[in-house]
Protein backbone atom coordinates (compact mmCIF):
# COMPACT_ATOMS: atom_id res chain seq x y z
CA UNK A 1 0.00 0.00 0.00
CA UNK A 2 1.13 3.55 -0.70
CA UNK A 3 0.99 6.46 1.76
CA UNK A 4 -2.51 7.57 0.69
CA UNK A 5 -3.90 4.07 1.16
CA UNK A 6 -2.29 3.84 4.62
CA UNK A 7 -3.89 7.14 5.67
CA UNK A 8 -7.27 6.07 4.28
CA UNK A 9 -6.95 2.72 6.06
CA UNK A 10 -6.32 4.37 9.44
CA UNK A 11 -9.24 6.78 9.02
CA UNK A 12 -11.55 4.05 7.72
CA UNK A 13 -10.77 1.68 10.59
CA UNK A 14 -11.25 4.49 13.13
CA UNK A 15 -14.69 5.29 11.68
CA UNK A 16 -15.55 1.59 11.52
CA UNK A 17 -14.66 0.96 15.17
CA UNK A 18 -16.31 4.19 16.36
CA UNK A 19 -19.48 3.46 14.41
CA UNK A 20 -19.75 -0.14 15.58
CA UNK A 21 -19.14 0.82 19.21
CA UNK A 22 -21.79 3.57 19.05
CA UNK A 23 -24.40 1.40 17.32
CA UNK A 24 -23.77 -1.64 19.52
CA UNK A 25 -24.00 0.64 22.57
CA UNK A 26 -27.39 1.97 21.43
CA UNK A 27 -28.69 -1.54 20.75
CA UNK A 28 -27.54 -2.99 24.09
CA UNK A 29 -28.77 -0.06 26.22
CA UNK A 30 -32.22 -0.04 24.60
CA UNK A 31 -32.46 -3.84 24.78
CA UNK A 32 -31.63 -3.88 28.51
CA UNK A 33 -34.08 -1.04 29.13
CA UNK A 34 -36.77 -2.91 27.19
CA UNK A 35 -36.21 -6.06 29.28
CA UNK A 36 -36.39 -4.09 32.53
CA UNK A 37 -39.50 -2.10 31.62
CA UNK A 38 -41.07 -4.85 29.48
CA UNK A 39 -41.91 -2.21 26.90
CA UNK A 40 -40.11 0.06 24.47
CA UNK A 41 -41.07 3.52 23.25
CA UNK A 42 -41.59 4.27 19.55
CA UNK A 43 -38.51 6.51 19.47
CA UNK A 44 -36.30 3.85 21.07
CA UNK A 45 -37.67 1.24 18.67
CA UNK A 46 -36.75 3.37 15.65
CA UNK A 47 -33.32 4.33 17.02
CA UNK A 48 -32.50 0.69 17.84
CA UNK A 49 -33.49 -0.44 14.34
CA UNK A 50 -31.32 2.33 12.86
CA UNK A 51 -28.35 1.19 14.98
CA UNK A 52 -28.73 -2.46 13.91
CA UNK A 53 -28.87 -1.67 10.19
CA UNK A 54 -26.00 0.80 10.49
CA UNK A 55 -23.81 -1.97 11.87
CA UNK A 56 -24.59 -3.93 8.71
CA UNK A 57 -23.97 -0.86 6.53
CA UNK A 58 -20.56 -0.27 8.12
CA UNK A 59 -19.56 -3.89 7.47
CA UNK A 60 -20.77 -3.66 3.86
CA UNK A 61 -18.77 -0.45 3.34
CA UNK A 62 -15.69 -2.01 4.96
CA UNK A 63 -15.94 -5.03 2.65
CA UNK A 64 -16.26 -2.75 -0.37
CA UNK A 65 -13.26 -0.71 0.75
CA UNK A 66 -11.21 -3.87 1.43
CA UNK A 67 -11.88 -5.23 -2.05
CA UNK A 68 -10.55 -2.04 -3.66
CA UNK A 69 -7.48 -1.65 -1.41
CA UNK A 70 -6.28 -5.22 -0.89
CA UNK A 71 -7.82 -7.20 -3.76
CA UNK A 72 -8.31 -4.71 -6.62
CA UNK A 73 -7.42 -7.28 -9.29
CA UNK A 74 -9.73 -9.98 -7.99
CA UNK A 75 -12.91 -10.15 -10.06
CA UNK A 76 -15.21 -12.38 -7.98
CA UNK A 77 -18.72 -12.05 -9.39
CA UNK A 78 -20.47 -13.74 -6.45
CA UNK A 79 -18.74 -11.50 -3.91
CA UNK A 80 -19.61 -8.39 -5.91
CA UNK A 81 -23.28 -9.37 -6.13
CA UNK A 82 -23.47 -10.36 -2.45
CA UNK A 83 -21.73 -7.13 -1.42
CA UNK A 84 -24.06 -5.09 -3.62
CA UNK A 85 -27.20 -6.71 -2.20
CA UNK A 86 -25.97 -6.38 1.41
CA UNK A 87 -25.14 -2.72 0.90
CA UNK A 88 -28.46 -2.05 -0.88
CA UNK A 89 -30.54 -3.57 1.94
CA UNK A 90 -28.65 -1.98 4.85
CA UNK A 91 -28.43 1.38 3.08
CA UNK A 92 -32.15 1.35 2.29
CA UNK A 93 -33.32 0.63 5.84
CA UNK A 94 -30.75 2.98 7.38
CA UNK A 95 -31.94 5.80 5.13
CA UNK A 96 -35.66 5.26 5.55
CA UNK A 97 -35.50 4.65 9.30
CA UNK A 98 -33.56 7.90 9.63
CA UNK A 99 -36.27 9.63 7.60
CA UNK A 100 -38.99 8.04 9.74
CA UNK A 101 -37.20 9.26 12.88
CA UNK A 102 -37.26 12.79 11.43
CA UNK A 103 -41.00 12.47 10.81
CA UNK A 104 -41.51 11.11 14.32
CA UNK A 105 -39.81 14.16 15.86
CA UNK A 106 -41.83 16.48 13.63
CA UNK A 107 -45.23 15.06 14.57
CA UNK A 108 -44.38 14.66 18.25
CA UNK A 109 -42.83 18.11 18.76
CA UNK A 110 -44.21 20.53 16.17
CA UNK A 111 -47.44 22.33 17.00
CA UNK A 112 -49.74 23.00 14.04
CA UNK A 113 -53.50 23.43 13.93
CA UNK A 114 -53.84 22.00 10.42
CA UNK A 115 -56.52 19.27 10.39
CA UNK A 116 -54.46 16.92 8.19
CA UNK A 117 -51.42 17.31 10.44
CA UNK A 118 -53.51 16.59 13.54
CA UNK A 119 -55.10 13.54 11.90
CA UNK A 120 -51.70 12.12 10.93
CA UNK A 121 -50.41 12.88 14.42
CA UNK A 122 -53.21 10.82 15.99
CA UNK A 123 -52.46 7.91 13.64
CA UNK A 124 -48.68 8.40 13.79
CA UNK A 125 -47.65 4.79 14.47
CA UNK A 126 -49.78 3.53 11.58
CA UNK A 127 -48.55 6.31 9.28
CA UNK A 128 -44.90 5.49 9.98
CA UNK A 129 -45.54 1.76 9.51
CA UNK A 130 -47.19 2.36 6.12
CA UNK A 131 -44.28 4.56 5.01
CA UNK A 132 -41.77 1.97 6.18
CA UNK A 133 -43.53 -0.86 4.32
CA UNK A 134 -44.19 1.33 1.27
CA UNK A 135 -40.51 2.20 1.01
CA UNK A 136 -39.85 -1.47 0.29
CA UNK A 137 -40.94 -0.76 -3.29
CA UNK A 138 -37.80 1.34 -3.69
CA UNK A 139 -35.72 -1.51 -2.28
CA UNK A 140 -37.25 -3.97 -4.76
CA UNK A 141 -36.44 -1.56 -7.60
CA UNK A 142 -32.85 -1.23 -6.48
CA UNK A 143 -32.39 -4.97 -5.98
CA UNK A 144 -33.78 -5.42 -9.48
CA UNK A 145 -31.02 -3.13 -10.67
CA UNK A 146 -28.43 -5.20 -8.80
CA UNK A 147 -29.75 -8.29 -10.61
CA UNK A 148 -29.46 -6.53 -13.97
CA UNK A 149 -25.93 -5.56 -13.02
CA UNK A 150 -25.19 -9.23 -12.29
CA UNK A 151 -26.32 -10.20 -15.78
CA UNK A 152 -24.20 -7.40 -17.22
CA UNK A 153 -21.16 -8.61 -15.29
CA UNK A 154 -21.72 -12.13 -16.62
CA UNK A 155 -21.67 -10.67 -20.12
CA UNK A 156 -18.51 -8.76 -19.27
CA UNK A 157 -16.72 -11.98 -18.37
CA UNK A 158 -17.65 -13.43 -21.74
CA UNK A 159 -16.98 -10.34 -23.87
CA UNK A 160 -13.86 -8.68 -25.26
CA UNK A 161 -11.96 -5.77 -23.68
CA UNK A 162 -14.03 -3.10 -25.46
CA UNK A 163 -17.29 -4.72 -24.40
CA UNK A 164 -16.07 -4.98 -20.80
CA UNK A 165 -15.23 -1.29 -20.66
CA UNK A 166 -18.55 -0.19 -22.18
CA UNK A 167 -20.69 -2.45 -19.98
CA UNK A 168 -18.87 -1.36 -16.82
CA UNK A 169 -19.47 2.27 -17.75
CA UNK A 170 -23.16 1.74 -18.59
CA UNK A 171 -23.96 -0.29 -15.45
CA UNK A 172 -22.13 2.23 -13.26
CA UNK A 173 -24.04 5.20 -14.73
CA UNK A 174 -27.39 3.40 -14.54
CA UNK A 175 -26.74 2.36 -10.95
CA UNK A 176 -25.87 5.90 -9.84
CA UNK A 177 -28.86 7.43 -11.65
CA UNK A 178 -31.23 4.97 -9.99
CA UNK A 179 -29.59 5.59 -6.61
CA UNK A 180 -30.04 9.36 -7.07
CA UNK A 181 -33.69 9.07 -8.08
CA UNK A 182 -34.56 6.70 -5.23
CA UNK A 183 -32.84 8.82 -2.59
CA UNK A 184 -34.53 12.05 -3.63
CA UNK A 185 -37.71 10.91 -1.84
CA UNK A 186 -36.31 10.32 1.71
CA UNK A 187 -34.06 13.37 1.36
CA UNK A 188 -37.05 15.53 0.38
CA UNK A 189 -39.12 14.22 3.30
CA UNK A 190 -36.31 14.88 5.79
CA UNK A 191 -35.75 18.37 4.37
CA UNK A 192 -39.45 19.18 4.77
CA UNK A 193 -39.31 17.91 8.37
CA UNK A 194 -36.41 20.29 9.08
CA UNK A 195 -38.21 23.26 7.52
CA UNK A 196 -41.46 22.53 9.38
CA UNK A 197 -39.62 22.13 12.69
CA UNK A 198 -37.87 25.47 12.12
CA UNK A 199 -41.21 27.09 11.29
CA UNK A 200 -42.82 25.54 14.39
CA UNK A 201 -39.96 26.79 16.57
CA UNK A 202 -40.14 30.32 15.14
CA UNK A 203 -43.90 30.40 15.69
CA UNK A 204 -43.44 29.19 19.26
CA UNK A 205 -40.79 31.84 19.96
CA UNK A 206 -43.07 34.56 18.60
CA UNK A 207 -45.86 33.41 20.92
CA UNK A 208 -43.48 33.38 23.88
CA UNK A 209 -42.29 36.89 23.04
CA UNK A 210 -45.88 38.11 22.60
CA UNK A 211 -46.83 36.86 26.07
CA UNK A 212 -43.65 38.29 27.58
CA UNK A 213 -42.14 34.94 28.53
CA UNK A 214 -38.52 33.83 28.20
CA UNK A 215 -37.24 31.77 25.29
CA UNK A 216 -35.63 28.98 27.33
CA UNK A 217 -38.77 27.00 28.09
CA UNK A 218 -39.14 23.22 27.75
CA UNK A 219 -40.78 23.32 24.32
CA UNK A 220 -37.98 25.47 22.89
CA UNK A 221 -35.30 23.12 24.18
CA UNK A 222 -37.14 20.08 22.78
CA UNK A 223 -37.41 21.80 19.38
CA UNK A 224 -33.69 22.60 19.38
CA UNK A 225 -32.66 19.06 20.35
CA UNK A 226 -34.90 17.59 17.65
CA UNK A 227 -33.49 20.01 15.07
CA UNK A 228 -29.93 19.08 16.02
CA UNK A 229 -30.70 15.41 15.39
CA UNK A 230 -32.68 15.93 12.17
CA UNK A 231 -30.36 18.56 10.64
CA UNK A 232 -27.26 16.47 11.40
CA UNK A 233 -28.93 13.46 9.76
CA UNK A 234 -29.83 15.53 6.69
CA UNK A 235 -26.34 17.00 6.28
CA UNK A 236 -24.50 13.72 6.88
CA UNK A 237 -26.91 11.85 4.61
CA UNK A 238 -26.45 14.45 1.84
CA UNK A 239 -22.67 14.14 2.18
CA UNK A 240 -22.88 10.34 2.17
CA UNK A 241 -25.14 10.27 -0.91
CA UNK A 242 -22.82 12.65 -2.76
CA UNK A 243 -19.86 10.41 -1.92
CA UNK A 244 -21.71 7.31 -3.15
CA UNK A 245 -22.57 9.03 -6.45
CA UNK A 246 -19.04 10.40 -6.98
CA UNK A 247 -17.45 7.05 -6.10
CA UNK A 248 -19.75 5.32 -8.57
CA UNK A 249 -18.52 7.62 -11.32
CA UNK A 250 -14.88 7.18 -10.22
CA UNK A 251 -14.47 3.41 -9.95
CA UNK A 252 -11.35 3.56 -12.12
CA UNK A 253 -9.87 6.42 -10.09
CA UNK A 254 -8.69 4.67 -6.91
CA UNK A 255 -7.72 7.79 -4.85
CA UNK A 256 -11.08 9.50 -5.51
CA UNK A 257 -13.01 6.30 -4.80
CA UNK A 258 -11.19 5.65 -1.51
CA UNK A 259 -11.60 9.28 -0.44
CA UNK A 260 -15.37 9.13 -1.08
CA UNK A 261 -15.76 5.83 0.79
CA UNK A 262 -13.82 7.23 3.76
CA UNK A 263 -15.88 10.45 3.93
CA UNK A 264 -19.14 8.56 3.39
CA UNK A 265 -18.39 6.16 6.25
CA UNK A 266 -18.65 9.01 8.71
CA UNK A 267 -22.44 9.10 8.15
CA UNK A 268 -23.38 5.78 9.85
CA UNK A 269 -20.76 6.37 12.54
CA UNK A 270 -21.09 10.09 13.27
CA UNK A 271 -24.87 10.35 13.34
CA UNK A 272 -25.15 7.46 15.80
CA UNK A 273 -22.84 9.38 18.16
CA UNK A 274 -25.13 12.40 17.76
CA UNK A 275 -28.14 10.20 18.57
CA UNK A 276 -26.44 9.07 21.78
CA UNK A 277 -25.64 12.63 22.82
CA UNK A 278 -29.13 13.88 21.97
CA UNK A 279 -30.96 11.13 23.83
CA UNK A 280 -31.15 11.70 27.59
CA UNK A 281 -31.19 8.01 28.53
CA UNK A 282 -28.34 7.03 26.22
CA UNK A 283 -26.31 10.07 27.24
CA UNK A 284 -26.68 9.31 30.95
CA UNK A 285 -25.61 5.69 30.50
CA UNK A 286 -22.66 6.76 28.34
CA UNK A 287 -21.46 9.34 30.90
CA UNK A 288 -21.89 6.80 33.70
CA UNK A 289 -19.83 4.30 31.71
CA UNK A 290 -17.09 6.89 31.19
CA UNK A 291 -16.96 7.67 34.92
CA UNK A 292 -16.68 3.97 35.75
CA UNK A 293 -13.86 3.53 33.23
CA UNK A 294 -11.92 6.41 34.81
CA UNK A 295 -12.15 4.92 38.30
Swiss-Prot record:
It is found in: Membrane. Pfam families: TAS2R. The keyword Membrane applies. The chain crosses the membrane at residues 6-26, 46-66, 81-101, 128-148, 178-198, 229-249, 256-276. GO terms for cellular component: membrane. Residues 1-5, 67-80, 149-177, 250-255 are extracellular. InterPro entries: TAS2R (IPR007960). It is a multi-pass membrane protein. Residues 27-45, 102-127, 199-228, 277-295 are cytoplasmic. Glycans are attached at residue 160. Its main location: membrane. Keywords: G-protein coupled receptor, Glycoprotein, Membrane, Receptor, Sensory transduction, Taste, Transducer, Transmembrane, Transmembrane helix. One of its GO terms (molecular function) is bitter taste receptor activity. Putative taste receptor which may play a role in the perception of bitterness. Several bitter taste receptors are expressed in a single taste receptor cell. Belongs to the G-protein coupled receptor T2R family. This is Taste receptor type 2 member 120. The lineage of its organism: Eukaryota, Metazoa, Chordata, Craniata, Vertebrata.
Amino acid sequence: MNLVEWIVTIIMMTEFLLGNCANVFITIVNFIDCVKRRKISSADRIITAIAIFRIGLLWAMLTNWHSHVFTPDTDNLQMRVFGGITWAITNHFTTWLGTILSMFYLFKIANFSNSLFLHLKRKLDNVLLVIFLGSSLFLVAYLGMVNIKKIAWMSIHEGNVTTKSKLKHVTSITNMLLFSLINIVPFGISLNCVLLLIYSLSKHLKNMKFYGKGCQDQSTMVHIKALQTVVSFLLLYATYSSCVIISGWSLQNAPVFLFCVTIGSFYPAGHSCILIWGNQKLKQVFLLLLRQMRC
